[in-house]
Structure formats: structure tokens, C-alpha cells
Amino acid sequence: MRSILLLLLALLSQAEMAPALTAEARYTHGVFYRDMQRQPVMQLKITGEPGEKITSITFTPGETSKPGDIKMVRLSSRDDWNGYTFNTAKYIHENAKGKFSKGKITFKQEYTLGSSPLYIWLSYDLAAGAVRNGKIDAVCTAINTEDGETTEPEVILADALEERKIGRVYRFPYRIVPYYRPRWVKGWGNAEKAVHLTPTHFNLFTDLIHFAYSVTAEGNIDYQWAGGGQSNKEVADEALEEIKRLHKEAKSKAKLIAGFAHMDGPMTTAVANPTTRRTMARNMATWAIERGYDGIDIDWEYPDSDEQWKNLGYFIADLREELSGSGISISIAASVGYKVPNYWTTDQLDFIMTMSYDDLTPDNHASMRLFQRDADICQNKFHMPKQKIVLGLPFYSNEQGKLTAQYGYSSVYNWNPRMKPDVNNCRLKNQDGTEGPMHTFNGPNLIAQKCRWAKENQMGGVMIWAYETDLPIKHKASLSRAMFKVLRQPKKKQ
């Protein structure tokens, strides 16, 4: 009798010690697109006693502006990774789908908990006519288990966030995204001949990347080199202040993105270690939130192996968790023909920007052929939706067959002021006045042609490297002038 009593007490003790089911909800994505399937809205992280069974999960559309824009609601899962990919057959498992009815949906889907956390993703298919800039939201109201218990997940937000920002449908039909180095914001180099930011620019492009930051191998945030013996921090901080002033003066709706680059060695080291990777994700998220950015762009040149690309994918998954509820976008710049893997990294991005230039072929370092090839790779190799493919334009020249001699477009033009708009190469003169090497670039006609192709093929837009080296926008030979005649920030919602 005593032994039976002891056994019952032991079983009761084990039951009391068994971990209760815990659930966390994170809003890891804040940018959504019209006419796109499997767009993640919420991540659930669930832990509990191994063997415990979940029998159903209920959601509502929360503060979604127009619930009717949600064509399909999907539930997916994975138990050993916190990232989401829409190519579900490879990396996560789509378990169920349905539609909201009377303001909710209950998935009667069974999950058995294991020793690792279970990650469940709620994703939406949005209608082609979804309201631009409309809110996209979800609330998990109940997670039910086999033993009759009901749990409502705790919403986890980014550490630096004071108030959650509900995700929104991207407000523009495409992106025009210049990179802008901080030392150019108030003038640098040949200031009277190069373009510099004015309020007008902020109502023409849709996003601006403040290309100012870097990282350390320990996962800390650093500043890029400012040049000229200036303080890296002061130049970057003053540039951000000026960018915000111009943005406000223009009453612009353009997004401001924090650009991280010049970090090959440190980035390689940091993302290879799970602890450092998470530290860097938290630091980067805090940095962007505290400074009021709308996005984070990573220009890592370059991950040189599949392992490094996979580590970048792990990092982006961690970064999304650390950005929970902020609405901040994540993008990368990539030479998409160079060791970029399918799905693992590219699926997690809000958009990718192709570096469709610096090609060593003899015709042009940034040909139309390369531009179209990169679009094809993103669509057919990475299976990326068109809305997420932003194609790169160069506003600079390369010496033919080399990458060691480059000049901004305004310099090339001012050395050859009689160039016609259809010219894409010229010989530069040496210092002694003799004929120098051939340089290739994109003239106004080719820039316009590329923009028309991107628009007609409904791509996600264009990115510009060396935007600040263009001629002033009112100049007849300005590349940005040619670009904005085809693609510009719409004055009204489209």
C-alpha cells in the first residue's frame, strides 16, 4: 500500500513539474504586396511537454483595413528553424488553408510537440486590388490542446519598440531605390557638377538607402569610412539629420533605409556563430528602430560559399524576430549570378536588389542583356515574385574589361560634353592629353530603355548605385531625369 502511495505521489510530482504549454507571437513581417501568395504575417513559437498535442488554433484578421483583401489564409510549420520561406515544399510544411468567416478562422490541425520549439506561421494570399498602404494584421486568440487547455500567445515586440506598427501593403506600384553615401549629402568632390539631394528628389524616388553603416565580428554596429580625415560618426549622423530634414520639407512618403556594407570579413565571422549572430540581429534592429528607419539593407560583398549564404539566411531569420512589430523591411543587394542559393535566403527578403553591373564582357559592364538575365535568375532560379525583384542601374563608368577604374557619370559627361543620349561608351583622355582607355556606362537612352522594360514586365522596380554622381536633375543629359520620365513616385495611389 505504501509503495502504491509513493508511486502516485511520484506521478503527481512529475505532472506538476511538466512544463506548461507556452506560446509567443511575433509580427516578423511588415511589408506586403498585392496579388502575392503566402505572405507571412505572424510567427508562433510554441513549447511544452514532449508528446503534448495541439488540436486547433484560432485567428482573427485584427486591424486589417479590408479583410476582404485576404483571399486565402494558410498555416505552415517547422520544428527546427525560426525562418519562413514561401517555397514550402523545400523548407517548411504547409498544413492547412482556409478563409476568414464571420471575423475568424479556426484551423483544426493537430501538432505534436517535441523537445524543440514548434514554429507555426500564419500567411496570407492578398488580392490584386488590395488597398495600397492598407493595414495587414492578425491576432491569435486561442491555441487548444488535447487535454482541453486553451492558451493565448504572448505578443513579443522588438526591444527598442515603444509601440507596435501594423504591417502595410506597399504603397507604390514599384520601387526606385538610390543608394546615397553620407559624405555626398551636403556636398563632396565636384559639388557644382554632381547631383545633391533636394526636397524634389524625395517626391521622385520611393526609397532612399542611407549607405552609412557596417558591423564588427563581435556583432556590434559600426560606421563606414567617411573619407577626407573626417569623423565617420559625425558625417553619417549629420547626413541622416539632413536627409530627415529634406524628407520632412518635401512631405515625402519615400521610405528611409539603413544601409550596412563594407563588412565581408566581420560579417562572415559574425553570422557563423549562433550567439554572435543573434547579438548582431538585436543590435541592428535596435539601431534601425531608434534612428527611425523604415528598412534595413545588407550589402555583403560577398558570401563566397553555400555555407555563408545559409548563415546569412539564419541571420535574417533572427533579425526578423528582433524586428517584431516594427514594420521594418529587410533587403539585400546581390550579384545574383554569384553563388546565391535558392530559397533559403531569398525567400526571407522583402525585396532583392540585383547588382546588374561590373560585368567584364567587352560590350558594356551593365548591358541590357545582363539586366534581363538577372531578372530571369530571380524569377526562374529563386522563384521570387516579380514584386520583390528590384533591378540595378549604374550611374558610373567602368574601364572596359576592368573593375579598377571607375568614374561617376557627371565626370564622364563633363569630359565629353557633346555625347549623344544613345552613347554608352567613350575613350577618356590621359593626363598628358593622349587618348586613354575605353570606358562603358549607361547613357540616358539605355537607362530609360531599362526602366521601360522593368515597368512593362511588372518588375519590382530599379535600384541605382552612384546616384549622387549624376548630373543635376534639370540637366538635359541627366540619367535620373531620363529615369524619372519612365519611373517615378506616383503622385496618387495607383
Task: Walk through the language-model features, giving the residues of each.
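A cross-domain feature marking catalytic cores of carbohydrate-active enzymes
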Residues: 180-182, 212, 258-262, 300-302, ...
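Exposed, polar/acidic Ser/Thr-rich sequence context and nearby capping/turn residues
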Residues: 17-170
